[in-house]
Amino acid sequence: MISLVGIATLILIAIALSHQRRSINWRTVSVAFVIQVLIGAFALYVPWGQTVLASLSGAVASLQLYANKGIEFLFGGLSSPHMFEVFGSGGFVFAIRVLPMIVFFGSFISVLYYIGVMGWIIRLVGGTLRLLLGTSRIESMVVTSAIFIGQSEVPLVVRPFIAKLTRSELFAVMVGGFAAVAGSVLLGYAGLGVELKYLIAACFMSAPGALLMAKLMEPETEAACTEQVVEALGQAENRPTNIIDAAAEGAQVGLRLALSVGAMLLAFIALIALFNGLLGWAGNWFGYPQLTLQLVLGHVLAPIAFLLGVPWHEAVLAGGFIGEKLVLNEFVAYADLANYLTPAKAAEAGVPLLSVHTQVIVTFALCGFANLSSIAIQLGGLTGIAPQRRQELARLGLRAMIGGTLSNLMSAAIVGFFISL
């Protein structure tokens, strides 16, 4: 039940960081929290909800089988299961088995947008949030879009209106981008060994969670002037000519994302190894040769992990993963977490096996784009659309990243409560 204390703590932190505490709309905040809790309960505690989630994750996972056809054509025997017979776990080549999934899923999502399926889903979910929470149509559409597309692409959904948004709406747009992950990378995380059903649940919990934290930290104090928003979805600039063009464009976007992910992982993992080597060398002088970045971050964030529901004896490890995600990115953190998920991987890496309880909580805590480098990504995208608001965006950047982080941690705390029942 420690997770209840964690939930209260996260809300208090958001209130403490609020720009206008007296203007907080408690109806909006309360309903957003209830929706986030209900999604968590539906996915993890209600038997029927677990069945639906399992079916949904099974459907998404089946896409991997179709993606494998393209992967096998490009890489031949290098993508064959026989690689595991020869190299053991070394037969899993990230660049072959995970990055191409991002390319395929990017193309698939683009096709769904072109034929109107994604637009219908976003309008349905976003419209429901708008009616229940009383938030503007822009905010509701953007946080819903963030479930499926990346933080750089989210503002493009409502590009003509970015310059006219109130400060609170703009902050909600930014928090929504930080709190979610793109649907195109879900299969990438799953390819590392992370449970797909938990990733899907975390994505849907991020929408109300983002609005919860955004409206606590930056309540609405102005009159929104964007309620006459047109159906931006389907009327976007540079819309694909036909379904083939949509598939090709999505594949190109997916390729850029895959190359970016691969480059970041190569650089960051190598830099972490270098930094850990230096820390170990320095720590050796003081009798701590095992000193690493993960260990330092783990001790700093262990209390937060504990409040989420992680047992204290695993809190340092969990805190290390959360710290990696904040300082570097979620892909690096998930790649590190993957070593702790199964007995075989843990034995090979020489690390302890995490309990299922902790695995679930950490999976939810990491499922978001909120990290320091993402601030630059968001500012670059938004200032390109609304350069006249550059200074305001810069002031909101760090606070929005914190809001996205609090949203992810709130999902983890809620899940921690339900799995402890």
What are the roles of these predicted feature ranges?
Residues 65-135:
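Hydrophobic alpha-helical hairpins/lids featuring a short glycine-rich hinge
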Residues 204-257:
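Long, contiguous bundles of hydrophobic transmembrane helices that form the permeation core
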Residues 19-20, 81-90, 129-130, 154-163, ...:
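Cytosolic juxtamembrane amphipathic/interface segments immediately preceding
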Residues 252-350:
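Transmembrane helical segments that form the transport core of multi-pass membrane transport proteins
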Residues 1-95, 245-248, 261, 265-275, ...:
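N-terminal alpha-helical transmembrane segments of multi-pass membrane transport
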Residues 130-190, 319-414:
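Alpha-helical membrane segments and immediately flanking helix-loop junctions
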Residues 1-8, 97, 146, 291-292, ...:
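Structural signature of hydrophobic alpha-helical transmembrane segments
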Residues 123-157, 224-246, 293-297, 321, ...:
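Juxtamembrane inter-helical linkers in multi-pass membrane proteins
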